[in-house]
Regions:
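A short mixed-secondary-structure module that forms the rim of ligand-binding clefts
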Residues: 32-34
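Hydrophobic beta-strand-centered segment that forms part of the acyl-chain substrate-binding groove
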Residues: 45-77
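C-terminal output/interaction extensions
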Residues: 109-127
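Catalytic strand-loop segment that frames the active site of acyl-thioester-processing enzymes
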Residues: 1-30
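Hydrophobic beta-sheet segments that form the core/acyl-binding groove
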Residues: 64-99
Length: 127
């Protein structure tokens, strides 16, 4: 995690498929839950290569603003920027664009975790 620095950026592009959409009138459009998934995935990809063995990360907060429709079959691109590091808490600002305009923005927080402790807790819940 020592190599993570404020200002780092990472982008990811998806083609909007049926599984990413909701119905609006006669149109299938990129859904807010799918936009949230793209935000989390892009931030995760930025941070993951910088973690130490035995560390993982989990999303803990997403504040999202979905600003415009993107039809199925079109591309959406998210660009995440790491804007703050507070011990194990990572804060990202993410902008989402389609081929025409900005269609979303988000603030996303992730926590770096100890995977052994995480899996122990999970196993207890599974019985």
């Amino acid at each position: 995690m020592d190599t993570l620095k404020v200002g780092m950026k990472h982008a990811q592009e998806w083609v909007v498929e049926d599984k990413h959409t909701t119905q609006r009138g006669d149109y299938r459009v990129f859904s807010t839950p799918s936009m949230t998934q793209l935000v989390e995935s892009t931030a995760n990809q930025l941070a993951a290569p910088h973690l130490k063995p035995g560390q993982g990360q989990v999303g803990v907060l997403v504040t999202i603003r979905h600003m415009g429709p993107t039809p199925m079959g079109k591309k959406v691109r998210a660009e995440a920027e790491l804007v703050a590091i507070d011990r194990r808490r990572l804060t990202f600002k993410v902008k989402i664009h389609d081929d025409v305009e900005q269609v979303g923005e988000a603030e996303h927080e992730r926590f770096v975790i100890d995977l052994d402790k995480y899996f122990e807790k999970l196993k207890k819940k599974l019985g």
